[in-house]
């Protein structure tokens, strides 16, 4: 079996494992009258006429290898919808577990790349984040420098010293604090690693540099003509750098020792948050690996954490989240708008978490969506559970109508 074949086999096992976990979660939550299989059968019926399509975005994976061919950096680049210039930079932790906790083995994305190369890495990223990539590209430090040259220099605020291993010794490349970085220095920060240290020790500085890149782009640094084909990640970066760019990092969750007996440098992605942001900026690219129904989730401005909790609750029962809208209607109780009336009993059972639920039929359903879940104040105004995720950047959450700020300052919901 080839290395790539092993990745496909692992990815299939991952999806099957997620569905098994979803079925167990359903039973644990007492939802005995609903089965994931019946959800699946309902969700796969023919699309009703006159559905609304989501705007099309281009999603690419940019991987950076250091001089030893170690996976040193990873980010998703997402275009704005349609033919707009600009986009999103979404750094992905390279230590994320590609198995999402299924099986006996924890396999970091760094290990996937080392074994299966960039194609295997792309498959793993798609599985972890439930997103479909249009393209993927691996660049060397020199190639990364050329790619980032149009935005350099950048003004970065480094949370900690940038350290690297030089001649078997740890040295400080850049001290913590404000600093100006040219393109070569940007790549140094993105690839620097002290041998033996955890990947998470690098993350604050990596996220800070991606934020600095987004800020440096301003209203555009490159030339891009609307309608120009985007066939490579290089094309996508050029398009993104031609307009306003937003950076958003993904937090991680420590893996319990009993699930990582080998003590590997592996973390779990905060999947609820990652899916929430991706379903916000690239709904047309979201996949549906779960056997349950596929949702669009809406909430009015100001409820980012509550919306994340709702996404997490849906993922737990094996549902899929394709779209998220932070500018939903203000309602007293939550409302579920069905694409098909026959899904009513399943939706009511699925959504006991959200309290009183008004159920109706969506007269303008979205393509690929079974249910539009509009969260009401009865659910949104409840006290949130104590956070269990760990993040590597300090951020404050607010809401506006259409923009999302960088991950190291204020996070604003689109």
Regions found by a protein language model. Give the residues of each.
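Non-catalytic, solvent-exposed segments at the cell envelope interface
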Residues: 2-400, 410-414
């Amino acid at each position: 079996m080839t290395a790539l074949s092993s990745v496909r086999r692992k990815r299939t096992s991952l999806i099957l494992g997620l569905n098994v976990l979803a079925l167990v979660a359903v039973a644990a939550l007492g939802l005995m009258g609903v089965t994931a299989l019946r959800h699946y059968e309902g969700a796969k019926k023919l699309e009703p006429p006159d559905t609304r399509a989501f705007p099309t975005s281009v999603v690419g994976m940019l991987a950076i290898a250091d001089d030893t061919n170690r996976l040193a950096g990873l980010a998703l680049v997402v275009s704005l919808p349609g033919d707009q210039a600009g986009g999103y930079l979404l750094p992905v932790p390279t230590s994320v577990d590609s198995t999402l906790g299924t099986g006996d083995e924890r396999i970091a994305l760094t290990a996937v790349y080392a074994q299966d190369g960039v194609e295997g890495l792309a498959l793993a990223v798609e599985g972890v984040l439930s997103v479909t990539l249009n393209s993927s590209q691996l660049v060397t430090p020199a190639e990364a420098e050329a790619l980032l040259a149009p935005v350099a220099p950048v003004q970065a605020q480094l949370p900690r010293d940038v350290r690297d291993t030089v001649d078997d010794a740890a040295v400080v490349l850049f001290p913590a604090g404000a600093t100006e970085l040219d393109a070569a220095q940007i790549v140094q920060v993105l690839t620097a690693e002290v041998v033996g240290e955890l990947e998470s020790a690098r993350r604050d500085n990596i996220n800070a540099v991606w934020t600095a890149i987004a800020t440096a782009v301003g209203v555009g640094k490159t030339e891009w003509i609307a309608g120009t084909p985007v066939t490579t990640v290089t094309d996508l970066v050029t398009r993104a750098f031609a307009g306003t760019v937003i950076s958003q990092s993904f937090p991680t969750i420590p893996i319990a020792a009993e699930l990582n007996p080998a003590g590997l440098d592996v973390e779990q992605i905060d999947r609820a948050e990652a899916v929430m942001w991706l379903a916000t900026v690239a709904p047309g690219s979201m996949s549906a690996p779960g056997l349950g129904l596929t949702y669009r989730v809406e909430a009015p401005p100001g409820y980012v954490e509550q919306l994340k909790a709702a996404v997490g609750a849906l993922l737990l029962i094996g549902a899929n989240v394709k779209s998220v809208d932070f500018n939903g209607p203000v309602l007293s109780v939550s409302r579920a708008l069905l694409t098909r009336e026959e899904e009513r009993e399943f939706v009511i059972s699925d959504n006991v978490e959200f309290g009183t639920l008004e159920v109706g039929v969506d007269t303008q359903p979205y393509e690929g969506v079974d249910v539009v879940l509009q969260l009401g104040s009865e659910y949104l105004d409840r006290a949130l559970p104590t956070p269990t995720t760990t993040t590597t950047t300090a951020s404050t959450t607010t809401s506006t109508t259409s923009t999302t700020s960088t991950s190291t300052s204020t996070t604003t919901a689109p």
